[in-house]
């Protein structure tokens, strides 16, 4: 399977009407566009509509009209192919810079889909503790990995988003993070050796 190759929806395998499919336009059109879609068996749809109405009455009419126009006038498949290629290229740029600039012992895998690189740094680094320095001194943000774990034991992990930045900014930002993590690890090594 190629990276970012679209897979058939799970609902296409459902022959008993048990699968509910939902999605969002935010990843394919605009991150701030909080409009999604839902496909469900008819028996469930009425209940789902009532649940949605109880939550927020309705989604933005303006956003829904804009999406309708886009889907009517533009080739969505061509747009998605361009996005996949763009995201694949940005992911590879980020992976190359992580490999070149992060401390030895860093592990990651390029995703087969999605917009994030999951990174495990050498033990002894705490990405939550380093986040403020990353943002204020290096002007780079990331998501610390510890909150993704029930016991928060993996404080040396982080999630990096490659969807929003141009390749040159990815190179600069990730190299800067690499310098921060390497410097922090060098400070930790003497203490770990005691």
Give the label of every model feature segment:
Residues 1-194:
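PLP-dependent class I/II
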